[in-house]
């Protein structure tokens, strides 16, 4: 009996050792008999993730090329050496090029958007806002919609003077002038914006223009287009669902408003040549916002195609309505048009061209007024979309300045006392332009930081010219000079103040190094003056 118990005990210990051994074996990595099912979803997700990330490399390996399906120019592949010098921006440029051109980019963008749209009801692109009822909005318009980062009072004062200078310059030449702002889509259809975007309770751009713009050249499009949108409601929209622009119905409405205003000064304007009320609807429009979300197969929507009572022709071959310069001619009108415009006028060209004998449409910046010499211009229209209004403060129009002959202003300036100063400004540009000779200068920080109007006098000739309160962004070499000589930080260069002035070749001849000049500056409705000498010219 004792022996039996001992043997039983021995067998029990052996069994225990065997079980422990099995347990140790089963807990060692790679030796489990079965893969746990609870880890299967993670494995599938990880595999798909790495497969998707590998698609661009796999596509490149087999020679697949990605087609540009977006409505923009993609970044070009950079070179390591440019102009026999190392390209120090190569890595940054390469990143931009690869981001724009990697294989399967359109398909991956579309997939990402669909995932976000279906799971979270948001856009898959930081540039697109998904609104109500499948409406899409351009994210670059959010500041305008929310009334954030609006133009300051000083910027509005400068803008008012910029528009006034162009209006007066054209009036002296017998040319009518219309300045108008194409509304952002969410300014016309705010009811389709997401609920979480709440505009501030401050004046919008229309109210700001009405309050502060001195020139009567401004034409309000916001109010009548908003009224039209509200009256038609869902029967006929005037902006695209999936595009940031108005559709042809909205463009026709804008054209009617513009031409009614123009006919006040041009009574024989054949407005009847505008398209009639008959139209055809085709579901063939690919909106720019839809292309951003799905470049490979963007959603299409309805476009309204209107008939026309007249014809026109292009004076030169046109690739698309996005061309920088487009010229048309018609045998119907007797007036000539110059229009500085952006992409919102793409749809206006078909509507305005039959109304004018000659029409020139320019998308170039800065606006070049030497184009009026190409035809006997009767009307200049400046159209710019609401979201880009700030560009008018960055690019001074190219137009030869006239000497000031306003006796009231000359008398007012003659009473302003001035003091001598030096090293208060530096010329950053001294080049020939289509208008003659362009000079541009930056004021040293702390001098005339709130300048609204700037007038330059050359004592040697007694002539006075009003300059634009605009400085274009300095190039790299000038920026280095400013940071070195004046100790200005790079981050503040874009906020500097100054002026730009276009002079005739004859007037520019007296602008020499150390030439004495007097600068009159209006700040807070008060004139100041300083005598100085041209430096850095």
Where are these regions (language model features)?
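Extracellular glycan-modifying ectodomains
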Residues: 2-537
């Amino acid at each position: 009996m004792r022996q039996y118990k001992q043997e039983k005990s021995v067998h029990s210990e052996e069994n225990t050792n065997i079980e422990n051994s099995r347990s140790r074996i089963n807990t060692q990595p790679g030796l489990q008999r079965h893969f746990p099912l609870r880890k299967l979803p993670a494995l599938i997700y990880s595999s798909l993730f790495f497969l998707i990330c590998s698609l661009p490399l796999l596509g490149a390996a087999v020679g697949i090329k990605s087609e540009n399906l977006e409505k923009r120019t993609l970044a070009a592949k950079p070179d390591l050496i440019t102009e026999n010098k190392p390209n120090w921006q190569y890595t940054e440029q390469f990143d931009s090029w690869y981001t724009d051109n990697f294989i399967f980019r359109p398909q991956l963008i579309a997939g990402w958007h669909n995932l976000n749209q279906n799971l979270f009801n948001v856009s898959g692109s930081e540039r697109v806002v998904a609104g109500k009822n499948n409406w899409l909005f351009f994210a670059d318009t959010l500041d305008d919609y929310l009334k954030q980062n609006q133009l300051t009072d000083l910027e509005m004062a400068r803008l008012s003077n910029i528009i006034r200078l162009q209006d007066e310059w054209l009036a002296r030449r017998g040319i009518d002038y219309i300045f108008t702002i194409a509304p952002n889509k969410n300014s016309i259809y705010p009811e389709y914006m997401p609920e979480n975007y709440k505009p501030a309770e401050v004046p919008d751009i229309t109210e700001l223009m009405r309050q502060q713009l001195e020139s009567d050249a401004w034409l309000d499009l916001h109010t009548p287009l908003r009224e039209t949108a509200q009256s038609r409601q869902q029967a006929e929209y005037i902006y695209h669902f999936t595009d940031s622009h108005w559709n042809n119905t909205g463009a026709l409405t804008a054209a009617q408003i513009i031409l009614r205003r123009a006919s006040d000064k041009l009574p024989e304007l054949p407005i009847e040549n505008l398209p009639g009320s008959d139209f055809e609807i085709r579901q063939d429009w690919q909106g720019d916002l839809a292309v951003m979300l799905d470049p490979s197969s963007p959603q299409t929507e309805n476009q309204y195609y209107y008939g026309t009572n007249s014809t026109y022709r292009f004076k030169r071959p046109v690739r698309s309505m996005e061309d920088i310069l487009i010229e048309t001619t018609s045998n119907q009108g007797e007036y000539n048009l110059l229009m500085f415009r952006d992409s919102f006028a793409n749809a206006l060209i078909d509507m305005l061209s039959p109304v004018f004998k000659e029409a020139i449409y320019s998308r170039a910046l800065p606006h070049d007024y030497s184009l009026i010499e190409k035809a006997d211009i009767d009307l200049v229209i400046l159209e710019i979309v609401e979201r880009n209004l700030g560009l008018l403060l960055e690019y001074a129009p190219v137009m030869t300045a006239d000497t000031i002959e306003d006796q009231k202003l000359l008398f007012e300036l003659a009473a302003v006392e001035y003091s001598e100063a030096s090293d208060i400004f530096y010329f950053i540009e001294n080049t020939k332009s289509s208008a003659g000779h362009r000079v541009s200068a930056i004021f040293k920080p702390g001098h005339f930081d709130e300048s609204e109007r700037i007038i330059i006098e050359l004592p040697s000739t007694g002539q006075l010219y009003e300059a634009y309160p605009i400085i274009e962004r300095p190039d790299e070499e000038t920026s280095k000079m400013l940071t070195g000589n004046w100790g200005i930080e790079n981050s503040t260069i874009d906020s500097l103040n100054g002026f730009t002035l276009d002079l005739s070749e004859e007037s520019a001849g007296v602008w020499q190094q150390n030439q004495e000049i007097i600068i009159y500056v209006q700040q807070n409705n008060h004139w100041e003056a300083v005598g100085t000498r041209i430096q850095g010219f």
